[in-house]
């Protein structure tokens, strides 16, 4: 109902009191959680602050139980989030680019910051939600289904120093999508 409520955070659980009415099974609702802090250490996975060629690099790897180390979620691989919005603010200098799941909804420049809004509209298990931040080289392509003529945007994000070595490999993406489309529909 758009109201701020209380919560209890113990261990890896956030408990939000239910309203005083019965919520029917299958009822869809959303919760907006403002989250900040230092991500919990999760071994080789989780939320990572790194450098590449002396430039800051942020990335995530959440498989299989490390999503909760960097964002509030039901971290259970057998369950899926209906959809996910990822909104990230980064400095404009260097020219950081945020890559994430789904489709980029917007990128807004505000002073010396950029705000990226990505949205995944399909059910996704929480450990597959990811983000990567770096001044990447980005290029775009498009897959066109031979069966339906449906199109799908393809976006490639790569470290600039690895572009030449990786470009020819990324050109295989459309052939791979064709194969997977033939095999799985």
Predicted regions and their residues:
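Short secondary-structure boundary micro-motifs
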Residues: 53-55, 70-73, 153-154
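Beta-strand-rich interaction surfaces with strong enrichment in secreted/lumenal proteins
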Residues: 3-6, 17-22, 70-76, 104-107
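Hydrophobic helix-coil surface modules that form long, contiguous segments used
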Residues: 62-63, 74-185
